[in-house]
């Protein structure tokens, strides 16, 4: 509580509720801090990366997968956007398997399309490959996707549980 005394303020005392709150604050145990800051890179030897990044990072039981493009054996696959969608999902499955997870444990998917007219074809394959219940999802058209000059029309990334 504050009381005015002339031009000065005096602190009479702090309320009991404030004191009990202060006493309830304790330092976080060290093992919690260590567990929260642990992150493990995941890379499948069966897949190649298009840049300086990890294919996934595992942190606190959650797997954050980098975007996958339709590459198999180091080459962009030819075919429809449906074929490319299937390959992206197969690549994600490989990364998740390497991380000790699976497609069943995906909770969020982000899809990046070079052309939103491909939305229906992507949905057809997506529905066939991913098990129910389907994860939360965003699908957006972007100006370009990686390796678009080589025919890439889609990139898919996801977040999954361990």
From Swiss-Prot:
The lineage of its organism: Eukaryota, Fungi, Dikarya, Ascomycota, Taphrinomycotina. Plays a role in the maintenance of mitochondrial DNA. It is found in: Mitochondrion; Cytoplasm. SUPFAM superfamilies: YjgF-like. One of its GO terms (cellular component) is cytosol. The keyword Isomerase does not apply. Gene3D superfamilies: RutC-like. The gene is mmf1. One of its GO terms (molecular function) is deaminase activity. This is Protein mmf1, mitochondrial. Keywords: Cytoplasm, Mitochondrion, Transit peptide. Belongs to the RutC family. InterPro entries: RidA, RidA_CS, RutC-like_sf, YjgF/YER057c/UK114.
């Amino acid at each position: 509580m504050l009381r005015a005394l002339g031009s000065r303020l005096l602190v009479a005392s702090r309320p009991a509720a404030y004191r009990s709150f202060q006493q309830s604050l304790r330092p976080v145990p060290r093992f919690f801090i260590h567990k929260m800051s642990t992150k493990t890179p995941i890379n499948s030897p069966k897949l190649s990366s298009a840049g300086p990044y990890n294919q996934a990072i595992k942190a606190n039981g959650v797997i954050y997968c980098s975007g996958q493009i339709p590459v198999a054996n180091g080459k962009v696959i030819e075919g429809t956007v449906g074929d490319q969608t299937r390959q992206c999902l197969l690549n994600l499955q490989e990364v998740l398997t390497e991380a000790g997870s699976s497609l069943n444990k995906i909770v969020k998917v982000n899809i990046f399309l070079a052309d939103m007219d491909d939305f229906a074809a992507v949905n057809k394959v997506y529905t066939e490959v991913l098990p129910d219940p389907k994860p939360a999802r965003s699908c957006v058209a972007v100006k370009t996707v990686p390796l678009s000059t080589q025919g890439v029309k889609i990139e898919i990334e996801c977040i999954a549980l361990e």
